[in-house]
Amino acid sequence: MSELLSVALFLASVLIYAWKAGRNTWWFAATLTVLGLFVILNITLYASDYFTGDGINDAVLYTLTNSLTGAGVGKYILPGIGIALALVAVFGALGWVLRRRRHHPHHVGYSLLALLLALGSVDASPAFRQITELVKSQMRDGDPDFAVYYKEPAKTIPNPKLNLVYIYGESLERTYFDNDAFPNLTPELGALKNEGLDFSHTMQLPGTDYTIAGMVASQCGIPLFAPFEGNASASVSSFFPQNICLGDILKNSGYQNYFVQGANLRFAGKDVFLKSHGFDNLYGAEELKTVVADPSYRNDWGFYDDTVLDEAWKKFEALSRSGQRFSLFTLTVDTHHPDGFISRTCNRKRYDYDGKPNQSFSAVSCSQENIAEFINKIKASPWFKDTVIVVSSDHLAMNNTAWKYLNKQDRNNLFFILRGDKPQQETLAVKRNTMDNGATVLDILGGDNFIGLGRNSLSGQSLSEVFLNVKEKVLAMKPDIIRLWNFPKEIKDFTVDRDKNMIAFSGSHFRLPLLLRVSDKRVEPLPESEYSAPLRFQLADFAPRDNFVWIDRCYKMAQLWAPALALSTDWCVSQGQLGGQQTVQHVDKAQWQGKTAFKDTMIDMERYKGNVDTLKIVDNDIRYKADSFIFNVAGAPEEVKQFSGISRPESWGRWSNAQLGDEVKIEYKAPLPKKFDLVITAKAFGDNAERPIPVRVGNEEQTLVLGHDVSTITLHFNNPTDANTLVIAPPAPVSTNEGNILGHSPRKLGIGMVEIKVVNVEG
């Protein structure tokens, strides 16, 4: 209703101003600004819905103040460009319409009415309401009801008798199981769901809407609210250290806790969370690659679901035989947005909707088949009678190729339980949310019927039942939940551990690199993750007077304040204000002691603008002074004009990447010497090893032969044509996820370059 009202007010404002207000520059500018704000808000709402499927939520608020980088972003570039072009077109059209009758005399009354209607359209828009509520949640001190409803459970189960298998289905919401809406999409897992306790109304709340957040909610009974973006949790050393979560209780009760997934455990700090709360046995992409039958059988995120669930079955079988009380948690990945992945063992690899194949539905149909096969193995085993199986979605599906069809339905998270000790078949329509999952499981295992804000759905009352406005209520509790992190409020002395890549201050530890915004009563950590911008881009968003401490590789800050360290990959510490003074210190000891020293100096806006502009220079445009191309730092020597076909810097150097160009091309500003030696330190990847690799300068071509290990080879060139471009053409680029950022499409690697040096031997 508010959406229709806001649109009606917007159109009324446009029509009244265009036809009645007449000409006046001030009123035109004011009205266009407010109407333009309405357009921006609604485009933001549309764009947010595209990424999250949940409008402008907590994750979007973070993204609006940081650049979106990381997993799968390439697939969103085109929609982003489209939105930007649409915004320009709409503003142009709006300005043209408002000035249609600019030659008419100005009328104050109609101008005022048009402006008031424009303001009303903004106030009535859903986007404005969502942003207002989010901003309020950042400014509140907390909610008095938090202390009433937050309950800490007993640390042990008195007499545990049942083992636990808990399966998180990536984005595998209950909506997919509506056979009327999506016929025969989930026959195997749907049949199992109908055999157990099926909770049909599990809603999604703020702070529970992505994987690590859904895991925290289901095990600790709280949303994942933190003083940083949730997927950046990998940088912290402990995770809600004061909370008692399901894993803690299980461990205290004699359980061995296992977690198995196909993706890297470091992503979003799942390893930190699980280790902080009772899990001693973790298996992710790195741990599984030495034990799976085919280590090369992977998708963009890690190992396929059939591989992961096979390993989970082996763990279940071995643990059951041992007689040890255990819990086994596993997380699938094949249904990850935007498209999903199809494992090779599925019987049904294709699902058509609206008369055409749909990749996301196909991935769901395949993944649920794999999950059902895993469950049926457990059910057929002699150990099922001592086992409770839980199947839940980690969160609702984000914007995938099935999303518009899902949104036509009443959407809920999946949560059902199969009890081997006491089979029970029932569909329960009680209103609940994912924070209730852990408490429900804990009670079945013999423990308390509450964890945090979660309640057992069989015997307690969920917050979703208590509060009609439960989403707003949870946002109001955000400051209370953030306080559970027990983060320090000041930093004076700190220690950088060079070997462990950690910084410690005021009793807290963080992984490096790290950026800190420091104020009188708050220290805000800004870690770097797959989903966040590089720290220098985050620093560029600081105000001129914001105090900062930035710990990163020296070369990243050298271009600003320490040119002598431009090629250093050691750790450096910079602190100061972007509009004032900055210092850079080289971390030259294993245990390096530092102190904060923020000087109250005059703010220089020219200095501030220059610093911000330099911080925002993209990696490939950075230039440094050196007599060779050093590939493990960003940028290139000053003599290089541009380069292509080269991937990002890694600790050892850079790979060629045929996804970015069929050949490696390095174009110099001036012609290369008439006669020179080309000294290349590099290695080959895959089938490129021990094969001739063409290297060209102008019309002359030499061949380079590399092995899998790094070696240095010198090639001799004559350059009579004064060519200025070096071309290296790996013969057999290999599509691989080797060293890839989680969730990115595979790279096509050829050679790994450490250093290239041009040595003039002319004359």
UniProtKB/Swiss-Prot annotation:
It is a multi-pass membrane protein. The chain crosses the membrane at residues 1-21, 26-46, 77-97, 108-128. The lineage of its organism: Bacteria, Pseudomonadati, Pseudomonadota, Gammaproteobacteria, Enterobacterales. Pathway: Glycan metabolism; osmoregulated periplasmic glucan (OPG) biosynthesis. It is found in: Cell inner membrane. It catalyses: a phosphatidylglycerol + a membrane-derived-oligosaccharide D-glucose = a 1,2-diacyl-sn-glycerol + a membrane-derived-oligosaccharide 6-(glycerophospho)-D-glucose. This is Phosphoglycerol transferase I. It comes from Salmonella choleraesuis (strain SC-B67). Belongs to the OpgB family. Transfers a phosphoglycerol residue from phosphatidylglycerol to the membrane-bound nascent glucan backbones. One of its GO terms (molecular function) is phosphatidylglycerol-membrane-oligosaccharide glycerophosphotransferase activity. GO terms for cellular component: plasma membrane.
